[in-house]
């Protein structure tokens, strides 16, 4: 019922919009089978728009990519692009719930002309996407709840429609209207079947028909359409209407205003066939009667006698109009039985509706009680949620505080550690600076030591050369000493020979002396010669002794020199070999040794060089003292 009130003013504007869309659909050039080709729509769209816009348009009109578009999909796509797809869904849902097939015995069930005058109800077609908003607001304003009014029993036709009648009327009017608009032209409209055979031209006469005839017609139609056992698609709507009849609470959420109902009638005259219009009028009369029944006795059951008296009174009142009095008087007698049956049937219906109302009232009270329990439960749950939120907030605050404390502690530890690391980094930087300075100094010292080592190597080479020269000189001296020995041996042999000669000469002189002593004069001269010979012999003996001593001294000196040369040669050879080994490992020592070790090695090398100088000086002095001729350079 709320859905009917939500778009109570929409079908008139919706009808005009759909008719205009029908004109556009026809202009676009549909095929004889009632479908519009997608290629045709794309070709027309490219004349007035861009490629992307045309693609979006085709996607909206043909979402399933079928290649063809019927009028229903065409309308749905246009409504979707305008932002009114929800309204179209509501209309289609009502259409699917209340549409009935067209009765086959109605030959004039065709769609009327599509020419529509905009001055029918004074409304203009809005051009914005929300073009039903004003009608909906007007319908909601006019559909406010109204209390039961004191109406005259003799004028039931003038009573306003109730919520049940408005819902039913809207459903009966909108469903065939929207169903017929979306069908092709070669198919009949989807209309509610009716058993009346009067044409639209007899509308003025039908308005004067008595309430009994109208009720009789409704009864015949109700036997076909609204029987409880009839599988009518509108049973749900009728059930809601009947359930609201017995309710003491007046609801007019689905009430259709008389202005809008007049607009519906004026609009639908161009669409519905005459029989459908007749059926709608009868339904409106039934709605008026039910509203009157509800207004006069909302909470009690109406007896059949009272209801028959009311109908008779209304019939007598309406039969006093003009030339139709005789016609109605004849029809009353023939329809008493039918009216009684219909009244009984309606009484049963009202009883059922009252029972349904009581049941719904009990259900409402039960639902209210359950709702109250649920409200209390919701309140309890809300309190529990609040308690849980409070507990969670406290726990969160406690956890946040603990995390803040831990974070502060970690920050302090981090700051302390950073300070220590910064201090350590500064110390390492200072040590690195000192080491760089030390490395530079050591490099300079290493370069100096390399230069000193080079000088020492040069001096060692010079000393080696000098030693080699000394060895050569020593060999020459040994050769010369050997020659001196040979010469001394020769001289000694010569001296021995000389001594032998002198001895023989001495013996000869002694013999000559003896010979000379024998004569007298010759004796004195021989004595002088003997004396001279003896003196010469003594001198020679002294010379021999001296030569022997010198020879002995020379031998001792030679032996001493040989021993000294041999010992010095061995010692010097050892020192030279040790120095050469140290010189060879000097580079490795420089690479691996420390500064103190390098200084000690340098001092040792200098001491070795000093000793070598002393040794060479001693050898030279010894040679100069004993045999300076050795140092003479002979060419």
Curated annotation (Swiss-Prot):
Residues 82-635 are annotated as: Necessary for interaction with RAB11A, subcellular location, homo- or heterooligomerization. The gene is Rab11fip4. Residues 147-176, 216-258 are annotated as: Disordered. Strongly expressed in the developing retina. Expressed predominantly in neural tissues. Residues 279-615 form a coiled coil. This is Rab11 family-interacting protein 4. Its main location: membrane. Residues 572-634 form the FIP-RBD domain. GO terms for biological process: cell division; neural retina development; positive regulation of G1 to G0 transition; regulation of cytokinesis. It comes from Mus musculus. SUPFAM superfamilies: EF-hand, Eferin C-derminal domain-like. GO terms for cellular component: cleavage furrow; endocytic vesicle; endosome; Golgi apparatus; midbody; perinuclear region of cytoplasm; recycling endosome membrane. Keywords: Calcium, Cell cycle, Cell division, Coiled coil, Cytoplasmic vesicle, Endosome, Membrane, Metal-binding, Transport. InterPro entries: EF-hand-dom_pair, EF_hand_dom, FIP-RBD_C_sf, Rab-bd_FIP-RBD, Rab11-interacting_regulator.
């Amino acid at each position: 019922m709320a859905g009917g009130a939500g778009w109570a003013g929409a079908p008139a504007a919706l009808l005009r919009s759909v008719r205009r869309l029908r004109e556009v659909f026809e202009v676009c050039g549909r095929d004889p089978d009632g479908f519009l080709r997608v290629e045709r729509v794309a070709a027309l769209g490219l004349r007035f728009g861009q490629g992307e816009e045309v693609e979006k348009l085709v996607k909206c009109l043909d979402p399933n990519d079928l290649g063809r578009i019927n009028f229903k999909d065409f309308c749905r796509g246009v409504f979707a692009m305008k932002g009114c797809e929800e309204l179209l869904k509501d209309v289609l849902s009502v259409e699917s719930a209340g549409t009935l097939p067209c009765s086959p015995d109605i030959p004039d069930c065709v769609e009327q002309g599509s020419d529509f005058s905009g001055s029918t109800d004074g409304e203009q077609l809005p051009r914005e996407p929300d073009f039903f908003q004003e009608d909906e607001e007007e319908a909601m304003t006019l559909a406010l709840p109204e209390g039961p009014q004191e109406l005259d029993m003799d004028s039931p036709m003038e009573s306003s429609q109730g919520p049940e009648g408005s819902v039913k009327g809207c459903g009966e009017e909108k469903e065939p209207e929207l169903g017929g608009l979306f069908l092709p032209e070669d198919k009949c409209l989807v209309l509610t079947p009716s058993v009346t055979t009067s044409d639209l031209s007899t509308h003025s006469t039908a308005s004067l028909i008595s309430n009994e005839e109208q009720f009789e017609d409704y009864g015949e139609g109700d036997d076909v359409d609204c029987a409880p056992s009839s599988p009518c698609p509108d049973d749900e709507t009728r059930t809601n209407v009947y359930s609201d009849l017995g309710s003491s609470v007046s609801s007019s959420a689905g009430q259709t205003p008389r202005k809008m109902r007049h607009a519906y009638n004026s609009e639908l005259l161009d669409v519905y066939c005459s029989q459908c219009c007749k059926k709608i009028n009868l339904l409106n009369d039934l709605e008026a009667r039910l509203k009157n029944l509800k207004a006069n006795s909302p909470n009690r059951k109406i007896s059949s006698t009272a209801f028959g008296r009311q109908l008779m009174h209304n019939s007598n009142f309406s039969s006093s109009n003009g030339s139709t009095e005789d016609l109605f008087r004849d029809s009353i007698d023939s329809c008493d039985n039918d009216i009684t049956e219909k009244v009984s049937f309606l009484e049963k219906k009202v009883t059922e509706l009252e029972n349904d109302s009581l049941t719904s009232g009990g259900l409402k009270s039960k639902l209210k009680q359950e709702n109250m329990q649920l409200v209390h439960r919701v309140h309890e749950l809300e309190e529990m949620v609040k308690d849980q939120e409070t507990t969670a907030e406290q726990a969160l605050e406690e956890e946040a505080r603990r995390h803040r404390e831990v974070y502060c502690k970690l920050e302090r530890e981090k700051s302390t550690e950073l300070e220590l690391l910064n201090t350590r980094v500064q110390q390492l930087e200072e040590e690195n600076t000192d080491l760089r300075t030390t490395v530079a100094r050591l490099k300079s010292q290493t370069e100096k030591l390399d230069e000193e080592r080079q000088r020492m190597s040069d001096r060692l080479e010079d000393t080696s050369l000098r030693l080699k020269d000394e060895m050569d000189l020593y060999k020459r001296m040994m050769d010369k000493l050997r020659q001196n020995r040979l010469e001394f041996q020769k001289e000694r042999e010569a001296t021995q020979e000389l001594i032998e000669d002198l001895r023989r000469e001495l013996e000869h002189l002694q013999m000559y002396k003896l010979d000379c002593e024998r004569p007298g004069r010759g004796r004195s001269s021989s004595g002088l010669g003997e004396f001279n010979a003896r003196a010469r012999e003594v001198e020679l003996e002294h010379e021999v002794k001296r030569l022997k001593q010198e020879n002995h001294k020379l031998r001792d000196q030679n032996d001493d020199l040989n021993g000294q040369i041999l010992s010095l040669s061995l010692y010097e050879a050892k020192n030279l070999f040790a120095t050469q080994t140290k010189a060879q490992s000097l580079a490795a020592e420089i690479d691996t040794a420390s500064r103190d070790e390098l200084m000690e090695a340098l001092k040792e090398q200098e001491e070795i060089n000093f000793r070598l100088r002393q040794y060479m000086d001693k050898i030279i002095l010894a040679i100069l003292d004993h045999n300076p001729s050795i140092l003479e350079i002979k060419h």
